[in-house]
């Protein structure tokens, strides 16, 4: 499937196996498959994880940021593979 950029969650879900509540990409702004990617995550301040990290001083946990980076990298690699249909591991 040829994806044009920017693209949203429907196109992202066509490439990645991740789904809510653990899909941490909102859009891919730019991607040269196998080379580089620019992706974004819209952070909802109502996410339940902010209730405990940290109360009254919400911070997006670093592990979530790392997962978003891994998902973006996976998208870039898997998009380069085209219809091969393999799941990538970092």
Regions found by a protein language model. Give the residues of each.
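Short coil-to-beta-strand transition motifs
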Residues: 18-24, 86-90
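Catalytic strand-loop segment that frames the active site of acyl-thioester-processing enzymes
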Residues: 20-60
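Short amphipathic alpha-helical segments enriched in hydrophobics
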Residues: 16, 32, 47, 73-80
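Short aromatic-glycine motifs in intrinsically disordered, low-complexity regions
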Residues: 7-19, 81
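Hydrophobic beta-strand-centered segment that forms part of the acyl-chain substrate-binding groove
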Residues: 2-6, 72-90
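Compact, glycine-rich, soluble single-domain proteins
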Residues: 51-61, 65-75, 90
């Amino acid at each position: 499937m040829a994806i044009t950029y920017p693209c949203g969650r429907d196109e992202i879900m066509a490439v990645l196996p991740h789904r809510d509540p653990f899909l941490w990409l909102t859009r891919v702004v730019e991607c040269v498959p196998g080379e580089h990617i620019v992706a974004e995550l819209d952070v909802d301040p109502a996410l339940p994880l902010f209730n405990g990290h940290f109360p009254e001083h919400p911070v997006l946990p670093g592990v979530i940021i790392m997962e978003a980076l891994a998902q973006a990298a996976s998208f870039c690699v898997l998009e380069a593979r085209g219809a091969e249909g393999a799941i990538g591991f970092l």
